[in-house]
Amino acid sequence: MKNIVKPGEVLKTAKKEFDQAYDQAKTKYQTAFKRIKPLAELDTLPVPPLVRAAYSDRMAWIMANMVQLAYVNFEENELEVERLDYALRSGAFNLIRTFSNKGTQAFLAKNDEFAVLSFRGTQPDKWEDIKTDINAIREKTVDGKVHIGFKTAFDDVKDLIIEELRINIGKMPLYITGHSLGAALATVATRELETEFSDQIAACYTFGSPRVGDSKYEKSVKAPFYRIVNTTDIVTLVPFLLGTFVHVGDARYLSRRKAEDGTYLIYRGMPNFIRTLECIAETLSALLHLSNPLSPWINAHSMEIYVEKLAGIAKQRNKPN
């Protein structure tokens, strides 16, 4: 009887290990977004396709940079707004407006060719963000069932966003993007804004997105949709309610392996066998280095890693002949 492990003890141990891994990764995760780089480097590449757009390595990199800029704390003071504005102007974008209500933050920007709506992701020290993430009750809509936390969070800024789009972007193509919680908000935004702006939504790019709704909801999203996943990114596996929540969009998988040219491999679709092997390899590597086995699963969610990998791929594939 001494060898029998109670289910409660297993859950308690798993929670303890997760908390330890989370604490180890938290500092890196939070500080990753403080090193905001200007966007001038993006001008070295040709302009990607804009209307009802197919997947583009260039646009994926642009959107990844836009998502990283969403982590500027522009809601805190004017200095941070100026910081965001400077970074955008360095890449020939103009800041139209920032949005902040409760736990939801986003900004709208545009250049001469297209507009971008970028949502901020989960901040580990913000209770509103955490509460949104864990509120996995599904709300029934005419288009299926959607995570009520994500839907409510988008509704907090929906009217303001629609107003700004009507006034400021005209008939411009609109790209929508986000990371983590922001990816979920971008998903909901894409579906909600299709009612009025369906002819203008060029594409939605998400990074490290959780599951957002059921299969009916997924099918209701008509805009081009690209879901980018980095190796063991743990957030892409939640909510852990398989069969009820599903992912939206055409997946692109960023591998831990590199090609001969030194760039990371990117797969179209989700190569489940390869991902399983890489997850095992990452976990074993952490154990061999005496780290918490969950650390690589959390570290892989860093937006900085997404930007680094996508930058290399975009530059390599768009080299002049």
Task: Please describe what each predicted stretch is.
Residues M1-T177, L181-N321:
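Non-catalytic, mobile gating and regulatory segments of ester bond hydrolases
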